[in-house]
Amino acid sequence: KHSLPDLPYDYGALEPHINAQIMQLHHSKHHAAYVNNLNVTEEKYQEALAKGDVTAQIALQPALKFNGGGHINHSIFWTNLSPNGGGEPKGELLEAIKRDFGSFDKFKEKLTAASVGVQGSGWGWLGFNKERGHLQIAACPNQDPLQGTTGLIPLLGIDVWEHAYYLQYKNVRPDYLKAIWNVINWENVTERYMACKK
């Protein structure tokens, strides 16, 4: 059974950039729903497997992708944020960003543009392409998980579903993007980068 991970900080810890009301709803309602629905879907999937019911297995794929992706994505997202975040990464990650995007500012512009440009709901990502040994920016619709759909290893995810910002930023997604850079946990992103380089 999957369970809702605890946040590594209080709901109000990311204010003024992301308010407590958003964080509480986002974590305790939205993420919790993905976890619950994933558990239900996996149970049904196990039953379908046991019966050899391929039609039922196929019918469950969208729910598995949506709720499984929602759980994976949010579990990364919470750790990608920190009340002590912001600024720039250091060391090897910063060097890789400069190598692959030209500069940290250019990287920020590109990931911001990819995230703002998502039509409807989805995510902007910084991922690691293991085959090429390079960082890449990608956008995924809905809750499609980055690694499961592109093969990139997720390092930093930016949730651009309206539930992530609407109560505070209304329909102005670029303002939310501008704010979120102040709470990016570069230590966590760096740990993820170093782990996938091994």
Swiss-Prot record:
GO MF annotation list: manganese ion binding; superoxide dismutase activity
Keyword Mitochondrion included in the entry's annotation: yes
Chain sites annotated for binding Mn(2+): H26, H74, D159, H163
Co-factor(s): Mn(2+)
3'-nitrotyrosine: residues bearing it: Y34
Keywords tagged on the record: Acetylation, Manganese, Metal-binding, Mitochondrion, Nitration, Oxidoreductase, Ubl conjugation
Post-translational changes noted in the entry: Nitrated under oxidative stress. Nitration coupled with oxidation inhibits the catalytic activity. Acetylation at Lys-98 decreases enzymatic activity. Deacetylated by SIRT3 upon exposure to ionizing radiations or after long fasting.
Catalytic reaction annotation: 2 superoxide + 2 H(+) = H2O2 + O2
Record's keyword annotation contains Oxidoreductase: yes
Enzyme class: oxidoreductase
UniProt cofactor note: Binds 1 Mn(2+) ion per subunit.
Sites of N6-succinyllysine modification: K44, K51, K98, K106
Residues modified as N6-acetyllysine: K44, K51, K90, K98, K106, K178
Enzyme Commission number(s) from the entry: 1.15.1.1
Cellular localisation: Mitochondrion matrix
GO cellular component, one term: mitochondrion
Pfam families for this protein: Sod_Fe_C (PF02777), Sod_Fe_N (PF00081)
Membrane-spanning segments: none
Subunit structure: Homotetramer.
Membership in a protein family: Belongs to the iron/manganese superoxide dismutase family.
Function: Destroys superoxide anion radicals which are normally produced within the cells and which are toxic to biological systems.
Protein name: Superoxide dismutase [Mn], mitochondrial
Organism of this sequence: Pan troglodytes (Chimpanzee)
Gene: SOD2
